[in-house]
């Protein structure tokens, strides 16, 4: 994920998926000059990331942690003051996107849905699907269309199958996209 300053944040899950023994992952920072350094560790299957429009906060989906985690971003791109942005009891956040009201949409594969939450975890809206939701992004002409990437998910073994069940679905969202990755 590239922020408004040109910094790229890259995460790794920390173990071989599927089938490997769980181990926490990391977030690495790649600066515009090509320097690379680790800026966070101990994250539980890190997935989607967003940065607020002011480039002050990075929010990470921790799929195995059932939460969205926030970090303050320093001027040099370092991450500090780790905290839970939203505890998603029973939710497994995958891809995420941020809207102009400060809410986050998260894709949830095993629960076959895309959910909009505010900081603290209050659920604002749920879009139930008939298959797993892997990614979401706000875009379109007015940046107010929520696009959802969904496919049938029968566990890790289904990744090697010949099924062709993927769809891109969309709805009109209550607020336009904001922050990074760029939605426009």
Positions of PLM-derived features:
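Blade-level signature of beta-propeller repeat domains, shared across WD40, Kelch, NHL, RCC1
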Residues: 137-184
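Beta-rich, blade/repeat-based domains predominating
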Residues: 1-8, 24-26, 36-57, 87-103, ...
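Glycine/Thr-rich phosphate-binding loops of Rossmann-like dinucleotide-binding domains
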Residues: 18-19, 68, 114, 156-157
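Conserved beta-strand positions in repeat-built beta-propeller and related beta-rich domains
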Residues: 2, 8-19, 58-64, 104-109, ...
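Loop/turn-rich, solvent-exposed surfaces of beta-rich toroidal or solenoidal domains
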Residues: 66-73, 78-82, 86-122
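Conserved active-site loop/cleft motifs that coordinate metal ions or position small ligands
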Residues: 106-107, 115-116, 124-127, 135-137, ...
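A short loop-to-beta-strand structural motif that recurs across blades of beta-propeller domains
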Residues: 25-28, 67-69, 113-115, 167-169
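Beta-strand initiation motifs
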Residues: 30-37, 75-83, 121-125, 176-182
């Amino acid at each position: 994920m590239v922020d408004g300053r040109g910094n790229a944040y890259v995460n790794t899950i920390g173990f071989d998926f599927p089938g490997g023994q769980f181990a926490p992952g990391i977030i690495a920072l790649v600066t515009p000059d090509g320097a690379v350094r680790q800026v966070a560790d101990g994250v539980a299957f890190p997935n989607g990331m967003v940065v607020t429009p002011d480039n002050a906060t990075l929010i990470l989906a921790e799929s195995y942690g059932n939460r969205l985690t926030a970090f303050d971003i320093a001027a040099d791109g370092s991450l500090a003051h780790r905290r839970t942005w939203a505890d998603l009891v029973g939710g497994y956040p995958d891809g995420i996107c941020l809207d102009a009201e400060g809410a986050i949409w998260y894709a949830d594969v095993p629960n076959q849905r895309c959910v909009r939450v505010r900081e603290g975890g209050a659920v604002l809206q749920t879009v139930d699907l008939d298959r797993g939701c892997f990614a979401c992004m706000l875009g379109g002409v007015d940046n107010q269309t929520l696009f959802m990437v969904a496919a049938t998910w029968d566990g890790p073994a289904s990744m090697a199958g010949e099924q062709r069940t993927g769809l891109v679905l969309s709805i009109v969202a209550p607020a336009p996209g904001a922050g990074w990755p760029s939605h426009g």
